[in-house]
């Protein structure tokens, strides 16, 4: 069995390979894709969403999947057949902009639909994966995925924290880099925001989606970013301009291990020091292990 590459996706093809054996993978071929399509329903997402396995000339980040005949894995389709993972529409088109929700930047809704499918099959979403949207233009596309922003950038990619990012698609928007540190008591989210003032940064928690949202603006010098640039340019020309300024946002999915009761009691805290925003999110105690039940 070939090693699964970047298995932190929520698409059934990848979830199928998590167990590492073809027997487990077999039921998750085309049937799982049809279930996913049925749950997705009418959508503004770009298609086509056709089910195909990996072609022989696959993308570098497309996994090498093998399986028995009829399982939906390892069966080489024609290269003229649309590939849902990378939107290929003709020979050697694996590098087209992704049209499949695995990669499309606007497919958080698709991930939510996939969670419903997973829930209906397994009865829970513990190992369904978290959406990280690595191909979002605001997230830096494939480079962001390769550098860790979506490819394992969070602790315990199966059922644990995994970042998902989305920002305004403007030339002044940027996505701050983050670290997520997991301890028995909390998740420590650390965002790199050099030049940001704490009054210009907003942190919010959505208990319905287990998401922590960080947003705000970083100004160059005076006033807002646009005004600051104009005033600076009046007094001199930029010979080099590399700092990331303007509006930013980052959403971090932390999962159901977060302790909602402690958050409601004011247990979520945030502080900024030396250009780093640090947020402590309480998590449920790790001492709650499996409890044996006596049959009477």
Swiss-Prot record:
This is SHSP domain-containing protein CPUR_05420. Monooxygenase; part of the ergochrome gene cluster responsible for the typical purple-black color of the ergot sclerotia. The ergochrome gene cluster produces several ergot pigments including the yellow ergochrome secalonic acid and its derivatives, as well as the red anthraquinones endocrocin and clavorubin. The pathway begins with the synthesis of atrochrysone thioester by the polyketide synthase (PKS) CPUR_05437. The atrochrysone carboxyl ACP thioesterase CPUR_05436 then breaks the thioester bond and releases the atrochrysone carboxylic acid from CPUR_05437. The keyword Disulfide bond does not apply. Residues 169-296 form the sHSP domain. Keywords: Stress response. Residues 50-83 are annotated as: Disordered. It comes from Claviceps purpurea (strain 20.1). Belongs to the small heat shock protein (HSP20) family. Gene3D superfamilies: 2.60.40.790. It comes from the Eukaryota. It holds the Pfam family HSP20.
């Amino acid at each position: 069995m070939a090693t699964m590459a970047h298995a932190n996706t929520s698409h059934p093809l990848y979830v199928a390979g998590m167990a590492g054996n073809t027997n487990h993978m077999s039921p998750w071929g085309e049937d799982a894709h049809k279930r996913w399509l049925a749950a997705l329903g009418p959508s503004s997402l770009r298609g086509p969403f056709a089910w195909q396995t990996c072609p022989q000339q696959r993308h570098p980040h497309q996994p090498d999947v093998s399986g028995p005949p009829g399982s939906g894995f390892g069966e080489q389709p024609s290269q003229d057949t649309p590939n849902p993972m990378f939107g290929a529409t003709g020979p050697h088109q694996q590098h087209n902009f992704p049209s499949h929700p695995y990669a499309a930047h606007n497919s958080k809704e698709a991930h939510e639909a996939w969670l419903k499918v997973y829930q209906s099959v397994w009865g829970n979403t513990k190992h369904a994966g978290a959406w990280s949207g690595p191909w979002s233009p605001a997230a830096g596309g494939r480079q962001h995925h390769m550098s860790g922003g979506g490819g394992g950038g969070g602790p315990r990619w199966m059922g644990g924290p995994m970042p998902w990012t989305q920002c305004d698609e403007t030339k002044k928007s940027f996505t701050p880099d983050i670290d997520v540190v997991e301890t028995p008591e909390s998740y420590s989210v650390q965002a790199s925001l050099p030049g940001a003032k704490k009054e210009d940064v907003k942190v919010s928690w959505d208990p319905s989606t287990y998401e922590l949202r960080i947003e705000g603006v970083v100004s160059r010098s005076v006033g807002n970013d646009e005004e600051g640039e104009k005033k600076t340019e009046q007094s001199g020309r930029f010979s080099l301009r590399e700092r990331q300024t303007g509006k930013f946002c980052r959403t971090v999915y932390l999962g159901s291990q977060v302790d909602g009761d402690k958050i409601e009691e004011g247990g979520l805290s945030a502080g900024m020091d030396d250009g780093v925003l640090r947020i402590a999110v309480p998590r449920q105690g790790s001492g709650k292990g499996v409890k044996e039940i006596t049959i009477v």
